[in-house]
UniProtKB/Swiss-Prot annotation:
Transmembrane segments: none
Protein name: Succinyl-diaminopimelate desuccinylase
Natural source organism: Methylobacterium radiotolerans (strain ATCC 27329 / DSM 1819 / JCM 2831 / NBRC 15690 / NCIMB 10815 / 0-1)
Function: Catalyzes the hydrolysis of N-succinyl-L,L-diaminopimelic acid (SDAP), forming succinate and LL-2,6-diaminopimelate (DAP), an intermediate involved in the bacterial biosynthesis of lysine and meso-diaminopimelic acid, an essential component of bacterial cell walls.
Reactions mediated catalytically: N-succinyl-(2S,6S)-2,6-diaminopimelate + H2O = (2S,6S)-2,6-diaminopimelate + succinate
Active-site residue list: 80, 145 (proton acceptor)
GO biological process: diaminopimelate biosynthetic process; L-arginine biosynthetic process; lysine biosynthetic process via diaminopimelate
HAMAP family linked to this entry: DapE
Family classification: Belongs to the peptidase M20A family. DapE subfamily.
High-level lineage: Bacteria, Pseudomonadati, Pseudomonadota, Alphaproteobacteria, Hyphomicrobiales
Swiss-Prot/TrEMBL cofactor(s): Zn(2+); Co(2+)
Chain's gene name: dapE
Length: 392
């Protein structure tokens, strides 16, 4: 049964409709139709651009807007989900089952539940205020966030910019709360930089080491140089940058052969002390200093589309925090922890904060959210809309 978008349980019904679309990235399977069908009767103009990139599947996206004047508040999110996995679910991952006060399904937390709350809050706001509310509301919803994210928000924003669309602030509905709704607003994200380090040696028999050059001691030496000293001590809103080695490999199954190369991969999550360029220069400096003339190496730093960024705690952040406090009684922490999100693209268009449901079970078997949290998050988004567009 289609959701009654104006019922008290509209967020739950919309979330169920979305979950019942098995939109494992990059498939849509009707998920964006659910969004469009909710917004179109309220007067939103709907666009459905599909973006392409060689080597990647074409991906549908949705842009919706009501109003052309005044400040524009954007709700952003994604309707694609990760695969359901191989574990046994207590409930069908694409049924949207409710049991013991919990909504189960892939995407319940990340982030079909958040999208549903945005939709329900906006429709209720328009019911209260009508179309002449003193501004504009837009939706940026992609089907390419859980995948490579090349045909999603980054291209949708460029498409909107070329059409002359302008935005003032954005709420991205990612599941930001660790354990309780209202705990945390994300006001920024760390950057991400991946490096591939290769130390060059000369293959030979282990019984004749003088005729070979073992690259493994050199790799250990260079790896130690990267982690011996902290990259920084952290900043006002960010923890210290962190470098982690993720793979080490010599490609050598033989026990009597000295390998010709030794490779390691690492990833750095970095704060706003650095850009990808300045961090790359520091990494190379440390390696060259440690290598001297004794170790031959190559370094491949993968281009990063995830710089560190911060949305300064200003009046908009305060507005959202006050809406959360009014509904939950909690004062949210302003955080920059966690991985990357599409906020890294949105921050170039307008200030962006992230606030959504509890993410404790996202990407897990039996992903679920509390039905009561869907209602509370809808109310929080409603308070944000009322405060952002106070009217006369």
């Amino acid at each position: 049964m289609p959701a009654d978008h104006h019922a008290p349980d509209a967020a739950l019904r919309l979330a169920q409709d979305l979950i019942r679309c098995p939109s494992v990235t990059p498939e849509d399977r009707g998920a964006l139709d659910v969004v469009a069908d909710a917004l179109r009767p309220a007067g939103f103009a709907i666009e459905r651009p599909v973006f392409a990139e060689p080597g990647y599947p074409d991906t549908p996206n949705l842009y919706a807007r009501i109003g052309q004047n005044g400040p524009c508040l954007v709700f952003a999110g994604h309707t694609d989900v990760v695969p359901e996995g191989e574990g046994a679910w207590r409930h069908d991952p694409f049924a949207g089952a409710v049991a013991d006060g919990m909504l189960y399904g892939r995407g319940a937390a990340d982030m079909k539940g958040g999208v549903a709350c945005m939709l329900a809050a906006t429709l209720a706001f328009l019911d209260r205020r009508g179309a002449d509310f003193g501004g504009s509301i837009a939706f940026l919803i992609t089907g390419d966030e859980e995948g490579p994210a090349v045909n999603g928000t980054v291209k949708l924003l460029d498409w909107a910019r070329r059409r002359g669309e302008r935005f003032d602030h954005c709420v991205l509905g990612e599941p930001t709360n660790p354990g309780r709704l209202g705990e945390m607003i994300k006001i920024g994200r760390r950057g991400s930089l991946t490096g591939k380090l290769t130390v060059l040696g000369r293959q030979g028999h282990v019984a004749y080491p003088h005729k070979a050059e073992n690259p493994i001691p050199g790799l250990l030496r260079l790896a130690s140089a990267l982690i011996a000293e902290p990259l920084d001590r952290g900043t006002a809103h960010f923890d210290a940058s962190n470098l982690e080695f993720t793979t080490v490999d010599v490609g050598n199954p033989a026990t009597n052969v000295i390998p010709s190369t030794a490779r390691a991969t690492f990833n750095v999550r970095f704060n706003d002390d650095w850009t990808a360029e300045s961090l790359g220069a520091e990494i190379r400096r440390r390696l060259e200093q440690a290598a001297g003339n004794a170790v031959r190496f190559t370094l491949d730093l993968q281009p990063s589309n995830a710089p560190a960024f911060l949305t300064r705690p200003d009046a908009f952040v305060t507005l959202v925090a006050e809406a959360i406090r009014a509904e939950t009684g909690l004062t949210p922490t302003l955080s920059t922890t966690g991985g990357t999100s599409d906020a890294r693209f949105i921050k170039d268009a307008c200030p962006v904060i992230e606030f959504g449901l509890v993410g404790e079970t996202m990407h897990q078997v039996d992903e679920c959210v509390a039905v009561a949290d869907l209602e509370r998050l809808t109310a929080i988004y409603g308070r944000v809309l009322d405060a952002y567009f106070p009217g006369s």
